[in-house]
Amino acid sequence: MTAGRVNPYSIVSSEEDGLRLTTMPGINGFGNGKIHTRRKCRNRFVKKNGQCNVEFTNMDDKPQRYIADMFTTCVDIRWRYMLLLFSLAFLVSWLLFGLIFWLIALIHGDLENPGGDDTFKPCVLQVNGFVAAFLFSIETQTTIGYGFRCVTEECPLAVFMVVVQSIVGCIIDSFMIGAIMAKMARPKKRAQTLLFSHNAVVAMRDGKLCLMWRVGNLRKSHIVEAHVRAQLIKPRITEEGEYIPLDQIDIDVGFDKGLDRIFLVSPITILHEINEDSPLFGISRQDLETDDFEIVVILEGMVEATAMTTQARSSYLASEILWGHRFEPVLFEEKNQYKVDYSHFHKTYEVPSTPRCSAKDLVENKFLLPSTNSFCYENELAFMSRDEDEEDDDSRGLDDLSPDNRHEFDRLQATIALDQRSYRRESEI
């Protein structure tokens, strides 16, 4: 079985140029009445990497609200800004308490008598200026304790400020460590190793028209209680004339039957049956080329290492849904284990037998389904693999024959008629 048999079944590239074909009537109705044009796709509500394409503006009291929830703000901001914020917090606290100690020394007269009078006892030893007071503040808050500068019992206010600075330093340290640990332990980055296919496909599955997309896990650690859900987002005008720019409609992926809960060890194809309850029930292949909607897909579960919930998101525009395609197989059995080849994860192949009409027309018997034994690419790969194994076994068996036995085998092979059934295509079997 040669590779030339699969040439009619093209592989679709995952790269999209952001444009799609639309149709419009021809001039004066001549010709086939269709002129192919290109128009720009709608803006995404959810980007392919899962980020929401939303910008908030004109928010009242935004800074005050963010400061009131300081911990969440520190966890959500970027690392560079968080480290800069804590560095500024430490620097401001050192400068503030350094200024306080300098003022205490100035009021007590420590700066006027740096060491000339042996009977004079300063509030803080070896603090003769602002720089020395600043260094004493750093040593106090960080508990370095070089030993040259220390507070005496001469000034109770200085002793009290040492206690206050120690407490403030502990609060800043605790807040910083907690924010850093919370930011590092967030399961958000776990979504970087959860993969969605670049395209969704529409094809027949068990005699029903279905929308399918593929999800995969790049890590060997499992996603516990993994489940999927999807929503269709498109503009809608209500019966009262109200325009809803982003109307969200749930897409059933088997919630009632428990099919939305998956065991994500190898890549899995998520399936949505296009039936009477589906928002895609009346959409045909031609409608898909001109329609304006977006399907947001969500994968949720708990990280096995931390038991924290993570969520991975992606979306498919109408131009990214391939009608009449199926995903290439990625799971193969090799020796005593299964092998997942992610080089085929995003690739699809065309299924010409897929009806072009909508599921609604299909239910109303407006389209005659092809034979259920139509050619299948996965079966072709399986047959190729089986035939190669059989050819290897046959070749090894022929090599073991003696010259006399080989001559007898060639003579019998030339006289015995071959079984024609073994040379028919799968669609004829």
Swiss-Prot record:
> Motif Selectivity filter in this chain: where?
143-148
Q: Where are the transmembrane segments?
A: 77-103, 156-183
Its GO biological process annotations read: potassium ion import across plasma membrane; potassium ion transport; protein homotetramerization; regulation of monoatomic ion transmembrane transport
Q: What is this protein called?
A: ATP-sensitive inward rectifier potassium channel 12
Record-linked Gene3D superfamilies: 1.10.287.70, G protein-activated inward rectifier potassium channel 1
What are the residue boundaries of the intramembrane regions? 130-146
One Pfam family of this protein, by short name?
Answer: IRK
Gene symbol here is: KCNJ12
